[in-house]
């Protein structure tokens, strides 16, 4: 099983590259997001590798970041999501963006990936919601992931307010997800969500 490749980038094609490792050319499938990060032809390249062994072929999938490789594997645990769909999702969303979309139940964001419809996106959120937060920064790893509706007005209002206060969208979304989890069972208003989110976003004193 190949876990990592380090070699010379020899060729770039639409959906894969060829990496020369000590005279052996390896075909490695990549996402669209990885392409702009590739070095020039003839230069050194290092990739995390996920190996798929099938009866008809052995396929290698390459990733610059370990988190991308981990999400690639997680996505394929969802019924209806194979390597092609998982790679399409990671070609559209970064690991942080994907974790944020799942945390906020943002079906539309996941559906931006080519070949990914609403039903598959809903299944991804349902199956992987407990996996999303550990991939984000500043996360309470023991906290269960809340299931948020992007159509929920207090949630949308709170997210907009936090962004207007100067926080990045991904930071605000993570804090908001944790705030909703902490307030589970209470009558939640946008003001209450904002207060709890600000506590999470405030630097420790």
Curated annotation (Swiss-Prot):
- SMART domains (alphabetical): HhH1
Any one Gene Ontology molecular-function term assigned to this protein's record: ATP binding
Q: Where is this region: Domain III?
A: 150-205
Give the GO terms filed under biological process for this record.
DNA recombination; DNA repair
Its cellular-component GO annotations read: cytoplasm; Holliday junction helicase complex; Holliday junction resolvase complex
Task: Report whether Cytoplasm shows up as a keyword of the record.
Answer: yes
Q: What is its main location?
A: cytoplasm
The cellular location(s) given in this protein's UniProt record come to: Cytoplasm
Keyword set includes Iron = no
| Span list, region Domain I | 1-64
Q: Where is this region: Flexible linker?
A: 144-149
Which family does the record claim for this protein?
Answer: Belongs to the RuvA family.
Subunit field text: Homotetramer. Forms an RuvA(8)-RuvB(12)-Holliday junction (HJ) complex. HJ DNA is sandwiched between 2 RuvA tetramers; dsDNA enters through RuvA and exits via RuvB. An RuvB hexamer assembles on each DNA strand where it exits the tetramer. Each RuvB hexamer is contacted by two RuvA subunits (via domain III) on 2 adjacent RuvB subunits; this complex drives branch migration. In the full resolvosome a probable DNA-RuvA(4)-RuvB(12)-RuvC(2) complex forms which resolves the HJ.
Domain characteristics, as noted in the entry: Has three domains with a flexible linker between the domains II and III and assumes an 'L' shape. Domain III is highly mobile and contacts RuvB.
Q: What is this protein called?
A: Holliday junction branch migration complex subunit RuvA
Q: Which organism is it from?
A: Bartonella henselae (strain ATCC 49882 / DSM 28221 / CCUG 30454 / Houston 1) (Rochalimaea henselae)
